[in-house]
């Protein structure tokens, strides 16, 4: 029985001050979906008996089988704060009434799917960060938290799996307190690293109620605020004073009936307030239930005035424990209260998020409407991903209304990522067929949706690839494109078993690239269809979807292949020169490597082609030691106008130079997209144009003359500058017990990996090993690792950086690198030998 109707939800949507949009983020297997279950049970969407095992937000069959979340799923819940006192505690925000609408998105934890997390974060304002008590803050916790803070999203923390610490590790109260406090400290360290002025201090403090402790599996959780409320009523003291005392170094002395900061009294140790007032009752319940002392349990229940249902009283052991703890500290109430009190409403959040969300000027009508979350302003809606419908081949567009109101039948401008105001490209004007409310795997039809809510749209999937902006204002710019922290580095090629199925495959590939924000599909010159993904697991899931859903035909799939990047190791040994086909124009160029930190700054979007060129020149001169005149004359970034290669104009007093600028830049984009060695993209090369000699007649220096010449001279300059290949490298974090560490080292050394850090988690027998592992060597790594450690090691790998491929020059066919290049060229259907620079270099 669902506890709310769609009409009630619709009524709440009109009060944006009472809406909370939040996503649940965490490391893999820290219990996001399990925690979400208890919230769903509270809202009556699933039965409370199932909560904790249903993982109701894992809607796909393969998610249930593998026990992992693959796609992020949205669900809307209805929550109330019955107590007037509580509503007064909502700091710095207005509220209207005591009913709240919570739009919750459960996101995956595997690093392969972190683009799903980005899509979820974009449409929410708050994040519930789940951390495992035993494992603490892991690599993926850090990644998702960094993504959240980058989107200006306010975090609150849940420390999950506390039952494990009590039942498996049998820790003492003080140890548990110390482990909590260590975990919270490491979360706060990450938060303070990415401090953002406009967001203010968002560190989490248990004594302010922004940290909850609990167990998703058993369905209980508490914040210090809840206990403070209980004791405040009992002892008649002020609740906020009580909250401060229940965390940190505060002790209650039962002899003098006073609070002190000093941990000893008359030579005896006093018990910390957190342990005495909060952990003690929990520990008592655990020991009474797990040691099967029926009478003690009954006494405790009476003391806490809890009434158990009749069938719950008959239970024993863990089942009884679950029932008692659920009655004593229900997780849903605790989490709902924390979200309502501490997460921002859309009205509050959009005021400071508008500048990071909107590309246009911050004072036009669209930006103002976003800042005030105005339902009457022009419609501004960002679609962050596509969700497949039950009807094959159609998609819901999933996004958030930032301003205005979206309704069925409304005519909107659908702006793709390359749209610029005033131009016609990447723009469609179409009517929205229906608006729906996303409820896990199902959808509920709804007439309209005001600003600040999360929505599904039907009928615009044909006009958007993966994400984009919907608006009714003709002057509105786009919402900023999402930055993904992973890049597709692993490829496999796909072929059909029966030739007549080819059209279905092509159609299927289109649908696949729609349904996943981070998958790339393209076909290369030899006619292969290639699918690229973020990692082995991601690719496996995508190809599975392709075969069974999107294309629905049997496929043959090649072995995984790694994407390389081409680069140079030194400066060109001589100036490269090329003549145009009609011999009237000459270009002179040299290539040299870019500094690694500059490449990273470009890839992270800190330095972009859209910056003001004077400001950019300042940064390049101050931080990277560039010559100021060079830094002002950067012609282009490539490939795709934003990659980490630069084209710099160093010419002096050349006639007609500006007329050929576009042609040279086109040639540069072409050359950097597919380099001379194996037609792989280039990275971290700086090309300097030294001199240009042009024909006086405009007709002899058109694009057809200049573009191929520019490409040839770029190739020659690259081949003269000690060309080499870069391979992608994963950062692997492995959690492993001490006795199995030898096996891990063995597997890593066999695969050219090197370990650069290991530390023990205090209070557990687990070690965390950090290592770099080339992507090329990572296929089948998980299986090997499990075999070597008999299943005790848990690896988590994420793309980290590019590294030069060792083993000789790519031009020498006998070396190791040369052989990789030959394989690559053979696969692409090119001549096997890498052409020498003579092919591109023209003598004077």
Swiss-Prot record:
<feature type="modified residue" description="Phosphothreonine">
    <location>
        <position position="59"/>
    </location>
</feature>
<dbReference type="InterPro" id="IPR027417">
    <property type="entry name" value="P-loop_NTPase"/>
</dbReference>
<dbReference type="InterPro" id="IPR000640">
    <property type="entry name" value="EFG_V-like"/>
</dbReference>
<feature type="modified residue" description="Phosphothreonine">
    <location>
        <position position="57"/>
    </location>
</feature>
<dbReference type="GO" id="GO:0003746">
    <property type="term" value="F:translation elongation factor activity"/>
</dbReference>
<keyword id="KW-0547">Nucleotide-binding</keyword>
<dbReference type="InterPro" id="IPR020568">
    <property type="entry name" value="Ribosomal_Su5_D2-typ_SF"/>
</dbReference>
<protein>
    <recommendedName>
        <fullName>Elongation factor 2</fullName>
        <ecNumber>3.6.5.-</ecNumber>
    </recommendedName>
</protein>
<dbReference type="Pfam" id="PF00009">
    <property type="entry name" value="GTP_EFTU"/>
</dbReference>
<dbReference type="InterPro" id="IPR005225">
    <property type="entry name" value="Small_GTP-bd"/>
</dbReference>
<dbReference type="Pfam" id="PF00679">
    <property type="entry name" value="EFG_C"/>
</dbReference>
<dbReference type="InterPro" id="IPR031157">
    <property type="entry name" value="G_TR_CS"/>
</dbReference>
<dbReference type="GO" id="GO:0043022">
    <property type="term" value="F:ribosome binding"/>
</dbReference>
<dbReference type="GO" id="GO:0003924">
    <property type="term" value="F:GTPase activity"/>
</dbReference>
<dbReference type="InterPro" id="IPR014721">
    <property type="entry name" value="Ribsml_uS5_D2-typ_fold_subgr"/>
</dbReference>
<keyword id="KW-0251">Elongation factor</keyword>
<dbReference type="Pfam" id="PF03764">
    <property type="entry name" value="EFG_IV"/>
</dbReference>
<comment type="function">
    <text>Catalyzes the GTP-dependent ribosomal translocation step during translation elongation. During this step, the ribosome changes from the pre-translocational (PRE) to the post-translocational (POST) state as the newly formed A-site-bound peptidyl-tRNA and P-site-bound deacylated tRNA move to the P and E sites, respectively. Catalyzes the coordinated movement of the two tRNA molecules, the mRNA and conformational changes in the ribosome.</text>
</comment>
<dbReference type="GO" id="GO:0006414">
    <property type="term" value="P:translational elongation"/>
</dbReference>
<feature type="binding site">
    <location>
        <begin position="26"/>
        <end position="33"/>
    </location>
    <ligand>
        <name>GTP</name>
    </ligand>
</feature>
<comment type="similarity">
    <text>Belongs to the TRAFAC class translation factor GTPase superfamily. Classic translation factor GTPase family. EF-G/EF-2 subfamily.</text>
</comment>
<keyword id="KW-0378">Hydrolase</keyword>
<dbReference type="InterPro" id="IPR035647">
    <property type="entry name" value="EFG_III/V"/>
</dbReference>
<feature type="binding site">
    <location>
        <begin position="160"/>
        <end position="163"/>
    </location>
    <ligand>
        <name>GTP</name>
    </ligand>
</feature>
<feature type="domain" description="tr-type G">
    <location>
        <begin position="17"/>
        <end position="255"/>
    </location>
</feature>
<dbReference type="InterPro" id="IPR004161">
    <property type="entry name" value="EFTu-like_2"/>
</dbReference>
<keyword id="KW-0342">GTP-binding</keyword>
<dbReference type="InterPro" id="IPR005517">
    <property type="entry name" value="Transl_elong_EFG/EF2_IV"/>
</dbReference>
<feature type="binding site">
    <location>
        <begin position="215"/>
        <end position="217"/>
    </location>
    <ligand>
        <name>GTP</name>
    </ligand>
</feature>
<dbReference type="InterPro" id="IPR041095">
    <property type="entry name" value="EFG_II"/>
</dbReference>
<keyword id="KW-0597">Phosphoprotein</keyword>
<dbReference type="InterPro" id="IPR009000">
    <property type="entry name" value="Transl_B-barrel_sf"/>
</dbReference>
<dbReference type="GO" id="GO:0005525">
    <property type="term" value="F:GTP binding"/>
</dbReference>
<keyword id="KW-0963">Cytoplasm</keyword>
<dbReference type="GO" id="GO:1990904">
    <property type="term" value="C:ribonucleoprotein complex"/>
</dbReference>
<keyword id="KW-0648">Protein biosynthesis</keyword>
<dbReference type="Pfam" id="PF14492">
    <property type="entry name" value="EFG_III"/>
</dbReference>
<dbReference type="GO" id="GO:0005829">
    <property type="term" value="C:cytosol"/>
</dbReference>
<dbReference type="InterPro" id="IPR000795">
    <property type="entry name" value="T_Tr_GTP-bd_dom"/>
</dbReference>
<feature type="modified residue" description="Diphthamide">
    <location>
        <position position="700"/>
    </location>
</feature>
<dbReference type="Pfam" id="PF03144">
    <property type="entry name" value="GTP_EFTU_D2"/>
</dbReference>
